[in-house]
A protein has these predicted regions:
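Acidic (Asp/Glu)-rich catalytic clusters
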Residues: 46-50, 76-83, 105-113, 145-149
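Core AdoMet radical
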Residues: 22-39, 46-69, 83-97, 113-140
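Conserved strand-turn element in the central/C-terminal portion of the radical SAM core barrel
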Residues: 125, 147-168
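Canonical Radical SAM [4Fe-4S] cluster-binding loop centered on the CxxxCxxC motif
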Residues: 1-34
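Distinct, well-ordered alpha-helical segments
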Residues: 69-77, 98-107
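Aromatic/hydrophobic pocket-lining residues that form the small-molecule binding cavity
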Residues: 72, 140, 168
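SEC14/CRAL-TRIO lipid-binding/transfer domains and related phosphoinositide-recognition modules
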Residues: 1-5, 43-50
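Short, surface-exposed connector motifs at secondary-structure boundaries
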Residues: 82-88, 153-158
Length: 168
């Protein structure tokens, strides 16, 4: 599993107010397992509800483009190689989309369908400071623009939280 620059001290400590200690991955398989083992555990967990050999591995908890590029590449490629994989979904922060990461995401996008989920939560910098997000709306927009330019085939999902204190 990855961590987050808003946890390890790069831009903050303790994370955003809405993230748990597991980085909002409370229902995900244990991150110490291999990617393959996590996919298989997830399939078992969902088997009662959905019967399918197709999977979209979801890198959810914390910031999944934040880490050593070779480790990220190995994790993404292991997921892509899993039998029945029809795409990959990667949740992260817009301020965790540096040049090496964008190049890697372009590689992933050339191999399979890619969705990148970006946590915005609020476009208000005042609210962002209150919830401890650790980056500005302008930084978010810069990250989205860079992602769209570099990986045009990727779907982008933006997470927002309606009704945050002080917003209407």
């Amino acid at each position: 599993g990855c961590t987050c620059p808003n946890i390890d001290g790069t831009c903050g400590y303790g994370g955003c107010i809405y993230c748990s200690g597991r980085g909002s991955g409370d229902f995900a398989p244990a991150p110490l397992q291999t990617v393959t083992a996590q996919i298989e555990a997830g399939k078992r967990q969902l088997a009662a509800k959905w019967q399918s050999d197709r999977v979209i591995p979801y890198f959810q908890a914390h910031s999944n483009t934040y880490g050593e590029i070779d480790r990220l590449r190995a994790a993404y490629f292991e997921a892509i190689a899993y039998p029945g994989t029809v795409g990959v979904s990667i949740a992260t922060r817009a301020d965790c989309l540096g040049g090496d990461v964008l190049a890697l995401l372009a590689e992933v996008s050339a191999m399979t369908h890619l969705t990148v989920e970006l946590g915005l939560q609020s476009a208000s910098d005042e609210t962002a400071a209150r919830i401890g997000r650790g980056h500005t709306y302008a930084a978010f927009c810069d990250g989205v623009s860079a992602l769209r330019r570099t990986v045009p085939a990727a779907d982008i999902c933006i997470h927002i939280i309606n009704g945050l204190p002080g917003e209407t």
